[in-house]
Amino acid sequence: AFYICSKITKNNSNIRPHIIYSLPFTSVIDQNYEVLKEIVENNINKEISSEDLMKFHSVVPIEYENFEGYDARFCFENWQSKIISTTFVQLLNTIFKIGKNSIVNRFHRLANSVIILDEVQAIDDKYYKIISEFISIMARQYNCYIILVTATMPMLLDTIDLIEDKEKYFRKLNRINIINNSESEITLDEFEDIVLEDILENKDKSFLIVLNTVKSSKNIYKYLKENTDRDIIYLSTEIYPKLRLEKINKIKNRNKKYVVVSTQLIEAGVDIDMDIVYRDFSTLDSINQTAGRANRNGVGGKGIVKLYKIVDNDRRICNYIYPRYLLNATEEVLDGKYIIEEKDIYDCNKEYFLKVKNRLSNDTSDELLDLIPKLQFKKFRDKFELIENDEFRRVDIIVNADNITSSIIQQLENDNEIDNIDLKNKFRILRQYTVSVSRKEMSEI
């Protein structure tokens, strides 16, 4: 991205391109921000300020160096920094929801920019067509350079590969083996026994067990806690963001061999390195992302990824989460393959995405595209939701976990004269301590 920016400036000294680095989730941005900060400081040879690099998402307090109040809010919401680290939701809302609130004030910052979408496979495939159309327009009309980054690139977007003969590099990879045990189904109880036996036999190995639902992940976490003295860490969306980040940083300690039980949140951009990985059956791109947590750094022998198909009440748990056509495509690709070496994953991905492309429905994208010539922009904005809004089915709970939350809650309860910016910042901080639960779960608390 720095190289492309320098080329743009060299060709036209009047243009000062921005870099917009987007990731799927706020938690991933928070994990990667310090690394990004170090890279930027090394590139510009000085300590950075808000003018150089800014983190922008719903949990970040509104701050901008040398400015206060509404001036800080203006610089923050208008993306005045040279490098913006943000989420897919914020980036794509800036493109698709122009005309709404403060978004209109930052749309112009996209022109002449280098836009990076990291872990692009995390985007819902029903939006692939319209996103492809719009980023093509951004490239042609607004002089944007779009970089899509993923180890499992969907062949559903028209792109130019920056690496020639990329297959050659994939075929040299030899860090992991995927052991496919998904030809038959097993119960969660049977899966628990298999995992426990492996953990007891390999006390010098770290383990990652990834389940498809919070319920199944909590069940196996409880079972392992009761039956082994290993240090077990649990991760899911039921853990508030600040604590999740602390747990992930703890897992990164290579001097200790943890057992980690998690939902799929571990997949995209979470930089941990485990020896043995277990995965409940899912779509191939999701399996590959989980496999990326095994022997990530290529040290300590070959990593093992063990794939199982778990059932609950005679129904596959994966069917609760993933579209049937994606699971079918995965089953067809893996059929007859017991051991899949890392060098063979590229061909599996290629076959998988060809199958997906032939079965993918573009109805949602087509409906959105049809609204544009009709000038139905409000309906267009309202219909595009990268993350489905289920506020009527879920409730946010603030966990009063430490002195920070206690102090903020006390101020909100007692101070009626908090200015608007300060109020926004306090709620942004509280989002780091917020979990979302279903209304049914809420009634049981």
Task: Locate the predicted segments by residue.
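SF2 helicase motor core recognition
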Residues: T94, V259-M274, Q289-N297
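Conserved helicase motor
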Residues: L53-F67, L211-K215, I232-I248, S262-E267
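SF2 helicase catalytic motif II
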Residues: V89-N93, I103-M138
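Walker A/P-loop NTP-binding motif
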Residues: A1-N14, V35
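Conserved Walker A/P-loop ATP-binding site and its immediately adjacent core
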Residues: I15-E41, H57-V60, M155, V214
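Inter-Walker segment of RecA-like/P-loop motor cores
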Residues: N42-K97
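Interdomain hinge/linker at the junction between the two RecA-like core domains of SF2 helicases
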Residues: Y145, V149-E201
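C-terminal helicase lobe and adjacent C-terminal extensions/tails of nucleic-acid helicase motors
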Residues: A139, D193-L200, D204, V210, ...
